[in-house]
Amino acid sequence: RFAAMTRFSPVLPIAFGESRFQPVYVDDVARAAAEAAMGETAAGIYELGGPEVASFHDLMVMMLAEIRRHRLILNMPGWMARATARSLSVAQFMTAGLFTNSVLTLDQLRNLSHDTVVSPGARGFAELGISPTPMALILPTYLWRFRPAGQFEAIKESARNLNGA
């Protein structure tokens, strides 16, 4: 959603930019679930997180670098983000659903207001014998479409190399 916003806005507003996340690749989670379903793991609760921990702000910086766009990241204060979310929710209610608030909800703000990382000492991928996939391997596979030239960006870059030779 944030990558799509960069197509039409010079500013990327975020809330709680200091909150930390540990993004995980869905295929790694699916592999862990498959092993659990097959009875190949010890019973219990596992917290699954990727190999890197980054702040929400830093994740936005990584995304902007990957899509090759420069935007001002504006970290809104919590009160402003809550007011925005409430206003959007009221607009959805007042229009009887004609306007759907897919921009910012109070639930999203609650999730953003605290760290979402694996707890210290929690069982995770290591206990399952799975090495989680780094973000750098996955981000290009789905963010390329948000680059200025989309799927043709690689062609443009190779042509630029030919012209410079």
Residue ranges of predicted features:
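Acceptor/aglycone-binding surface of glycosyltransferases and processive sugar-polymer synthases
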Residues: 1-12, 57, 65, 70-71, ...
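Conserved protein kinase catalytic domain
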Residues: 2-3, 60, 113, 139
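A conserved pocket-lining segment of Rossmann-fold NAD(P)-dependent short-chain dehydrogenase/reductase
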Residues: 4-24, 28, 32-49
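Residues at helix-coil transition
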Residues: 7, 38, 68, 140-144
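Substrate-binding strand-loop-helix patch
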Residues: 20-27, 46-66, 75-86, 131-133
